């Protein structure tokens, strides 16, 4: 079908283009209004003691779990090593283990808080692979739901975010406190 459609076109500029409509995402306006985006926000979050300001959900010895401040999918978390590196092979065994344990913990938080039914978990290593912060790797934990690719993104090219960052942050912290209380000796 595409081959026959393309053969009927005089040039590729006539090929139909998919357009994506924008929905207002108030938390993203900060990102676009920055004179220069802060490329070191992960290191700042690692050093800071103000977890709420940096949306840090939990801290461990070698890594921490934080919300993505500019998500396109509600609930998007990131497991981040304290040590700044863009090379996964330079991570120590304890760092790798802790990153993975934080990814598992993040999945539990999202399952219990948002009723997530599945997850995309992964790394973008290097700028050409889509890393927004290529020199400080981070493991993405993106919640998914059956039917989350509904008519809006398919037909209208639009994604909807159902909850603001601060409200979700508070819910994740409450869920984490409940989990810790239930697991206390």
What is each residue range found by the language model?
Residues 114-127:
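A short glycine-rich, hydrophobically flanked beta-strand micro-motif that places a catalytic Asp/Glu
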Residues 92-116, 166, 171-173:
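Long, well-ordered alpha-helical scaffolding segments within enzyme catalytic domains
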Residues 8-35, 144-185:
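C-terminal helix-cap and adjacent tail motif
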Residues 76, 130-150:
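Histidine-centered divalent-metal-coordination microenvironment in nucleic-acid enzymes
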Residues 70-74, 82-85, 144-148:
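Short connector loops/turns at beta-strand edges and beta->alpha or beta->beta junctions
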């Amino acid at each position: 079908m595409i081959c026959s459609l393309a053969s009927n076109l005089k040039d590729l500029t006539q090929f139909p283009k998919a357009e994506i409509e924008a929905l207002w995402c108030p938390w993203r306006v900060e990102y676009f209004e920055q004179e220069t985006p802060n490329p070191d926000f992960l290191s700042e979050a690692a050093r800071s003691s103000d977890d709420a300001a940096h949306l840090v959900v939990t801290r461990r010895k070698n890594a921490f779990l934080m919300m993505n401040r500019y998500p396109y999918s509600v609930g998007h978390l990131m497991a981040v090593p304290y040590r700044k590196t863009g090379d996964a092979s330079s991570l120590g065994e304890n760092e790798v283990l802790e990153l993975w344990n934080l990814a598992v913990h993040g999945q539990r938080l999202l399952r219990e808080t948002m009723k997530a039914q599945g997850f995309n978990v992964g790394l973008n290593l290097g700028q050409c692979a889509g890393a927004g912060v290529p020199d400080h790797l981070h493991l993405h934990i993106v919640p998914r739901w059956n039917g989350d690719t509904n008519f809006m993104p398919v037909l209208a090219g639009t994604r909807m975010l159902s909850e603001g960052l601060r409200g979700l942050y508070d819910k994740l912290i409450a869920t984490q406190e409940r989990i810790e209380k239930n697991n206390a000796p």
